[in-house]
Amino acid sequence: MLINHLSKIRTVRHFSNIKPVLSKEVSRRVIVAPASHFKTSSPNVKSNIPIHEYKQLPEDSNYIEKHYKELQVFLNEFLIKKLNKTYADFEGDPDELVFQLEKFIELEVTPRYTNHSAPDGCEERFKSIGDRIVVDRYLDFVKDVRLTLLLNGGHSFIFDVMLQAKEVFDKMQKE
């Protein structure tokens, strides 16, 4: 009877949510590549950021103007150094610019300011409160870049223009 009972035992699959030791996960953010990255995407796929005629940013566009430092760092450390591009090179594909920015934050900014020896789910992953502020500022930066692109018709050249104008203004102030 015991043998009959044992023969009816089914194997059960067990799932585990333990991440592998060699995982590349830095944060719990999910980054989705634009449709242009997938071979199966059709050419008619609409962009998340609509592309239309250029519209000037409002006078109170402090949401992007407060990020001059981040604009410059992203341009110098990632776009020019790794991709050999400027902001204007993403004209016509604003989703790609946002994706590259999210990738930069996830793969370069976040690891630079986090402590990888801290246990998962621990709020003290950041080396200091200042490091957390830097990462949060970059996360705000990507939101503000997306908002700017939505408001101005998806034209990325504006970021190059803003940086050039600030450089000229700073030179004038020094004189």
UniProtKB/Swiss-Prot annotation:
InterPro entries per record: Fmp23
Record localization: Mitochondrion
Location (main, coarse): mitochondrion
Entry keyword annotation includes ATP-binding: no
Sorted UniProt keywords: Mitochondrion, Transit peptide
A Pfam family reported for this protein in Swiss-Prot or TrEMBL: FMP23
Induction or repression: In aerobic conditions. Expression is regulated by copper levels and the MAC1 copper-responsive transcription factor.
Cellular-component GO terms for this entry: mitochondrion
Transit peptide feature range: 1-38
Misc. comment: Present with 2160 molecules/cell in log phase SD medium.
Function: May be involved in mitochondrial iron or copper homeostatis.
The protein's name: Protein FMP23, mitochondrial
